[in-house]
Amino acid sequence: LKGYFEIALRDGIKPVKEHLKSNYFGSSFTNDQIKDALKNHDMLDKAQYVDDIDDEVGELLATSDMVVARFSGRLEWGPRALGNRSILANPSDPRIVRKINNAIKMRDFWMPFGPSILSTRIDDYLVDPINSPYMMLAFDTTEKRDDITAALHPYDFTSRPQTVTPEYNSGYEKVLNSFESKTGIGGVLNTSFNIHGYPIVWDPERALDTLNNSSLDALAIGNYLVRK
């Protein structure tokens, strides 16, 4: 920042301070690149091309107990998975925590997951809510907490949510809207797409390796849906 200010002053430019609008700064991959990775893993025959993949993911989460990984767009930069390299599940059933831990995370049972919540629904679930797009703030929860119980701290029912807006991530918001339209629940459980002890996946090869080496039910990767 000091360098920026010095150069701006040197060149007669007024320094500008802007709020961070997004942290999806990582790599993205085309459907053709994803198709090549599916071929390399001999998985193309298991993959279904879905035009409206985000609506399909929301429906899967709403109508089954499936744990679904989502690989879409540019990789998140920072310590949290924010929908583009995420593992998603229905947050209303606390039994899903054990399933996720057994399937991929292998974490201690008491370690909490977090929810992604539509910004239009934060008043329903959070006490004194404000938008928190980076999953960095903690909140007490309201009486409607049972909707998202699997994505809360099991001791005090606090939440460290990601709030989702169409401006921030329109595709991920569509997943949540699809899920909400079928369940009435305004959020999903969201945890990072990786096996415990490994970094978050960043490319199609790592995504498919993780699918094959875990008990995930499905992977939405680009416009392809791969089911176990």
Descriptions of predicted regions:
Residues L1-K228:
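Flexible beta->alpha loop and helix N-cap segments adjacent to enzyme active/binding sites
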